[in-house]
């Protein structure tokens, strides 16, 4: 006889009737699934003395193992069974408990912020508890339940004890963010804001980044997904940057490091008293700082480091991530962003040389690189002609070929087009230039190096993210409401969170920069009858992202009318009366595939912004959504899926995830490796960039088997790089190569794709 150990420690014989009842409940109302298949799959794992929790895990695993392109609905079965386990683990029963008593209990445990009981009365908490919809737990797919249990639900990360369920998470996040909302502000009461925010998040219209999902409602208050830190060219400045990195990595943030100011190897120090050791030793120092903390058990530390392509050490910097070389001349655990501008591309196209300098030797050149392209070119030519300045001249095609080879071989050498970042950005580069991006290449905010650790005159940029789930929108008009809650919540978060450094707090509260993007674009295209490669869907993309930018600006203007414009609004192009529709890359207008009429009432909005200003300096950025897309059961960000079923590899094991509405849309989806090239995808990225005031985590993808000798020609890589630049794309993120990774004997790679875990902004950034 097999005996089962109950939660209270007592034992009882395995009840076949109870066992089958749970299985039947798991499949009830779900089409094209078999209760007997789930029961039989789990039966092989049953053993004498197993706990009820282990028994339930066996049922979940059995259902999850049955997920396939032919039987995608087992994802719902596995999700339902796993959600049952989550709620039993959290509450000891399936039903949600009293919301008030739940909060009191978790505040006393020290896992919830005690302000919840200070800012809300018992009656208000009871009202919000009644508003919670436990049935919305049924909306989660299996991958979502795994992520919730491992990453997002508040828990003891040593014992694994879970303290809450998903609907409480969504309500509590809203309660924390709007605890200081004044009744009547922007025409809404505080409880209306909390309830409205709960509705748009718990129904997946708005996707939240990992730091907010995992952290808001806990005593830890740092939720910006990514942090941008620029290093000064001095020992004190480098030390200050390193200190800031450690501070923020320990608070769940990914890091963007700007080190382009650092002088090159062999430069004089103190008028020749010493010789500079070059950039690489300091990059190793930054790498150690990044890897010093594990981000509270939620994410591993990660950073992208930025430098200009004309830096004197560029030939050594480009190869830092590859597997050749020795430990002394490699810094492999950082990613890299190579910053390029118009003149560098022109030298490439004209088959000319690029001259490399140490920034310290060419006064004004580094700053002009971002602020004024004409001034940069004049200074660059002047310094090229000055024989007294140390320099090196290399063929542009050789330098760019090395760049693209390293990008292809590592996948994680990124591109930042700094002229586009500043000319088609939210800020006036003369007063607030953008010097770098972030970990995942979607954030373009001003930074200023810290001269010393507590330098309040420095500027550390923080990006605060969320994403619209395009698949949940029945019409573009719905964006108005969702955009308002998104902007209001993220704006409130800027005041709610703590800041370890004045150099972050002062600009964060003065600029109030936000980055709202989208997830589920692949599903959105498919359900509307379009795909990535066909330009027929370009007009839909144009109309959708025009509406997104418009409604976000509208929401920020409404908040500015109610609360006041952000303090440094004058440093934006918006303050000069300019909108994204005024300064985008005009090459888009020359192509009928990318030139479409505007549909929104922009001039009326321009007038309101002129009158009230904006609450936020930036509103949009397109981040990766690998993790949060699993929560909302959506395709990742703007990316094409790799197959109808993705096998997500994480620290908690393998999880299968089916694309939305696969049965109905299986012939409409265009999968990553079915795209003939990058042109259709990059064109849609360019259309999105037309409206977005920050940048886009855009990837390039290559299948070597499409080319002679199974090798992607260098000319193809350079063509795509130039095409992206010509279309106004600000940044390029991953370079993905199809190499058969994850292929198993029983899997067709076109159907099942293995997605490896990544260091990430998580997004949020990845969100």
Regions found by a protein language model. Give the residues of each.
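Alpha-helix capping and helix-loop boundary segments enriched in small/acidic/polar residues
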Residues: 7-14, 161-164, 184-192, 212-218, ...
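Core nucleic-acid recognition elements
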Residues: 10, 33-171, 175, 188-198
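A glycine-rich phosphate-binding loop feature that marks nucleotide/adenosyl-phosphate handling sites
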Residues: 41-42, 60-62, 77-84, 214-218, ...
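Terminal amphipathic helices with adjacent charged low-complexity linkers/tails
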Residues: 74-107, 340-342, 421-452, 514, ...
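Catalytic alpha/beta core of large soluble enzyme barrels
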Residues: 119, 124-148, 435, 441-447, ...
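Function-dense linear segments that define catalytic or interfacial modules
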Residues: 154, 161, 168-186, 190, ...
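Internal maturation/activation junctions in enzymes
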Residues: 200, 218, 483-505, 531-625, ...
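Polar, glycine-rich mid-to-C-terminal structural blocks
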Residues: 319, 328, 332-403, 407-410, ...
């Amino acid at each position: 006889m097999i005996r089962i150990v109950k939660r209270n420690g007592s034992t009882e014989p395995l009840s076949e009737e109870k066992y089958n009842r749970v299985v039947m409940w798991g499949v009830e109302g779900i089409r094209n699934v078999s209760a007997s298949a789930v029961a039989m799959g789990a039966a092989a794992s049953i053993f004498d003395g197993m706990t009820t929790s282990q028994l339930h895990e066996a049922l979940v695993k059995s259902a999850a193992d049955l997920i396939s392109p032919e039987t995608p609905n087992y994802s719902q079965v596995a999700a339902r069974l796993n959600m049952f386990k989550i709620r039993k683990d959290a509450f000891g029963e399936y039903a949600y408990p009293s919301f008030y008593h739940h909060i009191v209990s978790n505040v006393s445990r020290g896992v919830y912020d005690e302000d919840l009981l200070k800012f809300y009365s018992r009656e208000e908490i009871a009202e919000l508890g009644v508003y919670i919809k436990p049935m919305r737990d049924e909306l989660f797919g299996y991958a979502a339940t795994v992520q919730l249990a491992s990453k997002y639900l508040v828990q003891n990360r040593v014992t694994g004890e879970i303290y809450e369920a998903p609907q409480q998470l969504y309500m509590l996040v809203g309660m924390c963010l709007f605890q200081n909302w004044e009744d009547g502000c922007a025409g809404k009461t505080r409880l209306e804001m909390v309830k409205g925010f709960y509705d748009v998040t718990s129904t997946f219209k708005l996707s939240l980044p990992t730091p907010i999902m995992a952290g808001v409602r806990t005593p830890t208050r740092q939720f910006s997904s990514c942090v941008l830190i620029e290093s000064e060219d001095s020992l004190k400045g480098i030390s200050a940057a390193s200190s800031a990195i450690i501070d923020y990595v320990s608070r769940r943030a990914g890091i963007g490091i700007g080190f382009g100011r650092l002088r090159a190897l062999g430069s004089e120090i103190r008028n020749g008293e010493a010789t500079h050791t070059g950039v690489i030793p300091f990059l190793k120092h930054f790498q150690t700082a990044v890897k010093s903390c594990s981000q509270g058990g939620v994410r591993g530390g990660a950073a992208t480091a930025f430098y200009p392509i004309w830096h004197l050490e560029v030939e050594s910097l480009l190869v830092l991530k590859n597997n050749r070389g020795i430990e002394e001349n490699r810094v492999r655990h950082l990613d890299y962003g190579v910053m390029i501008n118009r003149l560098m591309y022109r030298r490439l196209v004209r088959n000319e040389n690029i001259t490399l300098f140490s920034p310290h030797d060419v006064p004004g050149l580094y700053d002009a690189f971002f602020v004024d392209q004409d001034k940069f070119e004049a200074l660059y030519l002047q310094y090229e002609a000055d024989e007294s300045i140390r320099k090196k001249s290399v063929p542009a095609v050789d330098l760019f070929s090395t760049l693209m080879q390293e990008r292809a071989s590592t996948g994680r050498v990124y591109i930042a087009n700094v002229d586009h970042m500043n000319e088609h950005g939210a800020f006036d580069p003369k007063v607030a230039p953008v010097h770098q991006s972030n970990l995942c290449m979607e954030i373009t905010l001003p930074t200023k190096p810290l001269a010393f650790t507590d330098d309040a005159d420095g500027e550390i940029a923080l990006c605060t993210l969320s994403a619209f789930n395009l698949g949940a929108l029945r019409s573009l008009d719905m964006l108005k409401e969702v955009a308002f809650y998104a902007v209001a919540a993220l704006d409130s978060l800027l005041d709610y969170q703590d800041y370890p450094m004045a150099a972050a707090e002062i600009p964060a509260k003065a600029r109030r920069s936000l980055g709202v993007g989208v997830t589920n674009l692949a599903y959105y295209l498919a359900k509307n009858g379009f795909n990535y490669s066909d330009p027929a869907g370009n007009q839909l993309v144009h109309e959708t992202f025009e509406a997104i930018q418009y409604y976000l600006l509208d929401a920020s203007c409404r908040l500015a009318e109610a609360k006041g414009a952000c303090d440094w609004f004058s440093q934006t192009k918006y303050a000069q009366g300019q909108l994204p529709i005024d300064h985008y890359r005009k090459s888009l207008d020359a192509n009928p595939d990318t030139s479409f009429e505007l549909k929104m009432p922009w001039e009326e909005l321009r007038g309101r912004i002129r009158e009230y200003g904006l609450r936020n300096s930036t509103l949009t950025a397109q981040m990766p959504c690998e993790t949060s897309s699993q929560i909302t059961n959506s395709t990742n960000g703007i990316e094409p899926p790799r197959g109808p079923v993705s096998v997500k590899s994480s620290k908690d094991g393998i999880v299968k995830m089916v694309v939305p509405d696969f049965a109905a849309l299986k012939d409409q989806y265009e999968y990553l490796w079915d795209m003939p090239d990058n042109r259709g995808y990059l064109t849609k990225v360019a259309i999105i960039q037309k409206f977005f005031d920050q940048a886009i985590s855009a990837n390039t993808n290559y299948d070597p088997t499409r080319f002679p000798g199974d090798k992607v020609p260098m000319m193809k890589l350079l063509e795509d790089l130039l095409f992206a630049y010509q279309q106004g794309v600000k940044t390029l993120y991953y370079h993905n190569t199809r190499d058969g990774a994850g292929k198993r004997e029983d899997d067709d790679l076109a159907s099942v794709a293995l997605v490896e875990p990544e260091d990430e902004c998580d997004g949020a950034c990845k969100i």
